[in-house]
């Protein structure tokens, strides 16, 4: 049985003990193929954790287990435990709609709905809450402000979300996620399709959001992981090789495979 991995103890003790997500002995299968192998780690709340590793290492697969979005596809199964505030999200009695409001997700490619900017935000809220028009207006404004988009779109809320630039569309997707009041935000390569200026805005936004949300980001960009995260997990061939403070991972990793990856010897 693998040992629970938490970031180095030089992180303040309270940040380590207040785990938002605990993964215990997690295995994941695509059909008969084992994609995640006995993963165990603990993610602190209101902090940014990055998953890094070469393509096919399992980092996006692990991310998609957290809100069970893998169940949208056939022949994909998870074994073990993923605890959100102590409750196992893999329990078959879990309400998946409720789970996905608690754990929101933003994908690699911006995915605005083919509707107005306003409705992109309001649509998800209506699925879970009955609120007045005035309350909805406030919720939309608040979400767009949290995503650093309000000043750019406040005078064109009825315009199509598809009319926005790529970077604006991605921030709209973040606003849509924030609007349903999640506790955790999963980001799967959120800036990989964006230009450097839009990427910088997304990274600045991540830094601001961590005050209120637990954030997990998958990225191929190691410089980005170093800039935005407090903890980093390095994965390779479905295994968790090392998990520690981001600074330690990038300056003095314990594992040779980690050092080889971050220095470009493979990847």
Swiss-Prot record:
Q: Does the keyword Cell membrane feature in the UniProt annotation?
A: yes
InterPro entries named in the record: AAA+_ATPase (IPR003593), ABC_transporter-like_ATP-bd (IPR003439), ABC_transporter-like_CS (IPR017871), P-loop_NTPase (IPR027417), PstB-like (IPR005670)
Gene3D superfamilies registered for this protein in UniProt: P-loop containing nucleotide triphosphate hydrolases (3.40.50.300)
User: What keywords are annotated for this sequence in UniProt?
Assistant: ATP-binding, Cell inner membrane, Cell membrane, Membrane, Nucleotide-binding, Phosphate transport, Translocase, Transport
Reactions catalysed, semicolon-separated, are: phosphate(out) + ATP + H2O = ADP + 2 phosphate(in) + H(+)
* Key word DNA-binding present: no
Which NCBIfam families does its entry note?
3a0107s01c2
Name the family the entry cites.
Answer: Belongs to the ABC transporter superfamily. Phosphate importer (TC 3.A.1.7) family.
Role description: Part of the ABC transporter complex PstSACB involved in phosphate import. Responsible for energy coupling to the transport system.
- Can you name this protein? Phosphate import ATP-binding protein PstB
Q: Which organism is it from?
A: Mesorhizobium japonicum (strain LMG 29417 / CECT 9101 / MAFF 303099) (Mesorhizobium loti (strain MAFF 303099))
Gene from which the chain derives: pstB
């Amino acid at each position: 049985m693998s040992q629970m991995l938490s970031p180095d103890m030089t992180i303040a003790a309270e940040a380590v003990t207040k785990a938002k997500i605990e993964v215990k002995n997690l295995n994941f299968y695509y059909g008969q193929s084992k994609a995640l192998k006995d993963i165990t780690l603990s993610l602190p709340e209101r902090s940014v954790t990055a998953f890094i590793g070469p393509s096919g290492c399992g980092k996006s697969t692990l991310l998609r287990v957290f809100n069970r979005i893998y169940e949208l596809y056939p022949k994909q199964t998870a074994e073990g435990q993923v605890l959100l505030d102590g409750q196992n999200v893999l329990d078959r009695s879990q309400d998946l709609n409720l789970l996905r409001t608690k754990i929101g997700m933003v994908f690699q490619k911006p995915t605005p709905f083919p509707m107005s900017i306003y409705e992109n935000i309001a649509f998800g809220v209506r699925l879970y809450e009955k609120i007045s028009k005035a309350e909805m207006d406030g919720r939309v404004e608040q979400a767009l402000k949290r995503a650093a988009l309000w000043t750019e779109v406040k005078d064109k809320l009825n315009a199509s979300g598809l009319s926005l630039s790529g970077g604006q569309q991605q921030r709209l997707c973040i606003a849509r996620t924030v609007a349903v009041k999640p506790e955790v935000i999963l980001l799967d390569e959120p800036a990989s399709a964006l230009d450097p200026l839009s990427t910088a805005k997304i990274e600045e936004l991540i830094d601001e959001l961590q005050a209120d949300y637990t954030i997990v980001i998958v990225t191929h960009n190691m410089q980005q992981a170093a800039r935005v995260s407090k903890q980093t997990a390095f994965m390779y061939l479905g295994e968790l090789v090392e998990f520690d403070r981001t600074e330690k991972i990038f300056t003095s990793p314990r594992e040779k495979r980690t050092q080889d990856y971050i220095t470009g010897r493979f990847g």
